[in-house]
Amino acid sequence: MTDQTAAGRGDLLSKVPAVTLAFWIVKICATTVGETGGDALSMRLNLGYAVSSLIFLAFFAIAVTFQIGAKRYHPLIYWLVVVATTTVGTTTSDYLDRTLGLGYVKSSFILLAMVIAILAVWRRTTGSIAFDHSTSRKNEIFYWLTRLVSNTLGTALGD
């Protein structure tokens, strides 16, 4: 994808990939790497879920800052942020379940409520929910926040 503008309005073209077979293959690989990384830090290195979540949240913040600051779609940056969301999702889901003792059902309902709230605020703030294209910084922030919380929800539901 190039650094062109959409309809001459100055909006950047989409910085998210098209959803194709290749997308799903890379998504599965990124999820596997993220879950493995989350478990490695929290369990194998025995840092615990809270510390691991904070480390991966910092990693996510750095990666998403590069993604949002980019002028065009960069696959490496995009997928790095996706891996970051899966590592945060893994450790945060386990923190809610095991450390706080909420269990996966309660955690899932809390996370679902958070996703719904984010989507509602996104819609109210921007007038739409743009999943297939992020043409403004505000949309991109909402997009990544939704991805972060929904990945955590997906981990809780999967466990």
Which ranges hold each PLM region?
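C-terminal ends of transmembrane helices
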Residues: G8-L12, A61-L76, L119-T135
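Short, Lys/Arg-rich, polar N-terminal cytosolic tail immediately upstream
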Residues: M1-V16
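Membrane-water interface at transmembrane helix exits
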Residues: G38-S42, S93-G101, G158-D159
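Cytoplasmic-side transmembrane-helix entry/capping segments in multi-pass membrane proteins
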Residues: H74-A84, S107-I110, D132-Y143
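Short, hydrophobic transmembrane alpha-helix segments
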Residues: G37-N46, G69-A70
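Surface-exposed interaction/gating patches
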Residues: I129, H133-D159
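Structural signature of hydrophobic alpha-helical transmembrane segments
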Residues: R44-A58, G101-V115, L157
